[in-house]
A protein has these predicted regions:
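Helix-loop boundary and gating motifs at the non-cytosolic
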Residues: 5-62, 211-254
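Conserved MFS/SLC helix-loop-helix module at the cytosolic interface between two early adjacent transmembrane helices
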Residues: 66-101
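Helix-to-loop junctions at the C-terminal end of transmembrane segments
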Residues: 67-80, 164, 263-277, 358
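Structural signature of the two symmetry-related core transmembrane helices
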Residues: 83-97, 174-177, 277-291
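Cytoplasmic helix-loop-helix junction between adjacent transmembrane helices
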Residues: 112-151
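Intracellular juxtamembrane helix-capping segments at the cytosolic ends
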Residues: 120-133, 238, 314-327
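C-terminal transmembrane helical hairpin of 12-TM major facilitator-type secondary transporters
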Residues: 278-317
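A late C-terminal transmembrane helix in Major Facilitator Superfamily
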Residues: 331-363
Length: 395
């Protein structure tokens, strides 16, 4: 096990651009995480539609966001932050000023349109975080960003659910989306740098996709997909287990403990002196997810979830770190867009895959199926790396 030292965090956090990027990223992501759960509540309660209808809306918006990732990232590389973010702000302002107050079909259309022009939050934040520090602190900085994501994921949905129980969901949805618009305006004003010292500036000649959009990059992106398959599927399976043992009121507690494990794991990974391959971390995450299928009480599920959670943020961090080192700086926006789209796709696949397994084999089957996906992808990735190294040695 590599040695752990928190000195890299002290060095990284001396960077004002890094601190700025982390704060901006958190402010912009909070409304995104809050809106995901709030849209479901709004469709089911205020619009009086089914959970299926809510799922269709979520899936449509997810596909739109996944499609937008690479081309919005490419525009970031070509034109810079402000020229990409401004249209997103205007589209979001128009769409979400109307969407909370209309019927389901119009809401669906506006959500898809807003998704296609969504602020490329993850691509911008990750580029700004990478640009803010040197090569030696990159993994630590990305780990800090992963911790910020975990905090947003834990806090934002909880606040949104609470607000939806107190006020009308239409106005809560409107308020949260306008906060997102405000965060986008702040990002536009601050305009954090997306290139580090000595790297190609935005708008310079692009590297051909044939030089980087190849097997090594795609393999890392596939690992990112498998990671979110495991996480999204586990999310559904946790809910299923808690319902099965009649402990629905403690679902939030189990999810919070799971998220706490991820937060701690992310901090520890950033403190390591040497990186660990994303494929090994994915294998560990999948292996740690299997025991969650055996849990038959809240304590057992929370404990096993905490252990699995320790590898959640590190696995995602490792895929981002490896992907960013594979591609040239002048196409990093597009690369991070592709990485984000692969992760979004994994989330969209993991939930229904686990749901299908749960319907056929019970709550524990959800964990088993998504963990198996993680094991298979990790094994394929490790095999590909071994073959590549053997081939390189032979030549």
């Amino acid at each position: 096990m590599p040695a752990v030292s928190f000195a890299p965090y002290r060095r990284a956090l001396r960077s004002k651009p890094l601190r700025t990027a982390l704060v901006l990223g958190t402010l912009v992501r909070m409304p995104v995480f809050a809106s995901t759960v709030l849209l479901t509540i709004h469709v089911v309660s205020s619009l009086d539609r089914s959970y299926t209808a809510a799922g269709v809306l979520a899936a449509a918006a997810t596909v739109a966001i996944a499609v937008s990732g690479p081309w919005r990232g490419r525009l970031l590389d070509r034109y810079g932050l402000r020229r990409v973010v401004l249209p997103s702000i205007l589209v979001a302002l128009v769409c979400w000023s109307i969407a909370p107050f209309v019927d389901y079909l119009l809401l669906l259309g506006l959500a898809v349109l807003a998704g296609l022009f969504v602020i490329p939050t993850f691509s911008i934040t990750r580029q700004a975080v990478i640009a803010a520090v040197g090569e030696e602190e990159r993994r630590t900085a990305i780990s800090l960003d992963a911790v910020a994501v975990e905090l947003s994921f834990i806090v934002a949905p909880a606040v949104a659910v609470w607000a939806a129980t107190v006020w009308d969901t239409s106005w809560v949805l409107f308020t949260i989306q306008m906060l997102g618009v405000g965060a986008g305006i702040l990002m536009y004003v601050v305009d954090p740098p997306l290139r580090g010292e000595g790297e190609a500036v935005v708008g310079t000649a692009r590297a051909s996709s044939r030089t980087w959009f190849r097997l090594p990059f795609l393999a890392v992106c596939l690992a990112a997909t498998a990671t979110t398959v495991v996480l999204a599927g586990s999310d559904i399976a946790i809910i299923a287990v808690m319902r099965d043992i009649a402990a629905e009121g403690q679902i939030g507690l189990v999810l919070a403990v799971w998220g706490l494990g991820s937060l701690i794991g992310g901090l520890l990974y950033g403190a390591l002196h040497r990186p660990i391959s994303a494929f090994w971390l994915l294998a560990g995450l999948a292996a740690a997810t299997f025991p969650m299928a055996l849990a038959s009480s809240t304590v057992q599920l929370a404990a096993s979830g905490f252990v699995a959670g320790l590898l959640c943020a590190p696995t995602i961090t490792a895929t981002i770190d490896q992907a960013s080192r594979i591609v040239p700086a002048q196409v990093r926006g597009e690369a991070m867009g592709w990485h984000g789209s692969f992760m979004t796709t994994g989330g969209a696949v993991g939930a229904p895959l686990a749901g299908l397994a749960i319907d056929r084999g019970g709550p524990g089957a959800g964990f088993v199926v998504v963990a198996a996906v993680g094991v298979v992808v990790a094994a394929l990735g490790l095999t590909a790396v071994s073959v590549r190294r053997a081939t390189a040695s032979a030549t």
